[in-house]
């Protein structure tokens, strides 16, 4: 695929993002209304797309995706753990700051850019399962783990943590992650396919597609709005998070894919899924803990801008 072909492929995607940026930057949306757009994508449109995609996939086809699932777990959760250890023991961050920094370096905005970018390359139906698996990894494993570690760091500083409260907090974090539509919808759908070999009737697919088909455009617009309403204040931690997200993590995923022996198309999917900009959700978790709020918000914007350069390069090298 030539550079011109790639730019033509990505042009509609970046056009909608830029349109969203104008809407956010010039006041058509504020933080509250932008959250409403994001909620439409993450709690309704994308879960509907996942259900329709997974429940029209055969059990054998689903099982063929297992190596890709393993790669995504290692490439996302494993990367988080590596950065966490580096921050904690080399840069001497406290545990909470280490967890926040690592989460923002590891969590991609797959929910907003996965369908438009990967769908343009492989077709929307072909990428439903990889994106759904990423949703489970992020919402049911990564976010709860990061929240638990950050909370332990806060509690240990205050010397208030007890065994009971730790396990209660752990259970609540995992349960919250599993209850998120981005995790619950694909997880339940996968169980229906793997255990019961269930296939959704055509009428059900059409009903879900009425909402799921809106995912691409609305999701990209939401990314642009989110970037547009944020202010940028460059710092070394912000630049570091952005570079880890769009350059280092995709490179690590390439090595993981080679080690596991993924075929070329799955390698491209795995690399692109982690190469997307940092996640606004991860930046919100930083705000929750009142740690590196400015840095993570800036990193989100910077990584989104850098992805305009990195994504075409990655597609040219792998697709």
UniProtKB/Swiss-Prot annotation:
Keyword match Transport: yes
Protein name as it appears in the record: Uncharacterized transporter YwkB
Family indicated by similarity: Belongs to the auxin efflux carrier (TC 2.A.69) family.
Compartments (UniProt record): Cell membrane
Organism, scientific name: Bacillus subtilis (strain 168)
Lineage: Bacteria, Bacillati, Bacillota, Bacilli, Bacillales
Signal peptide (residue range): none
Alphabetic keyword roster: Cell membrane, Membrane, Transmembrane, Transmembrane helix, Transport
InterPro entries: Auxin_eff_plant, Mem_transp_PIN-like, Na+/solute_symporter_sf
Top-level taxon of origin: Bacteria
GO annotation, biological process: transmembrane transport
KW Signal (keyword) present: no
Topology term for the membrane: Multi-pass membrane protein
Transmembrane segments: 3-23, 36-56, 66-86, 108-128, 129-149, 181-201, 209-229, 238-258, 267-287, 299-319
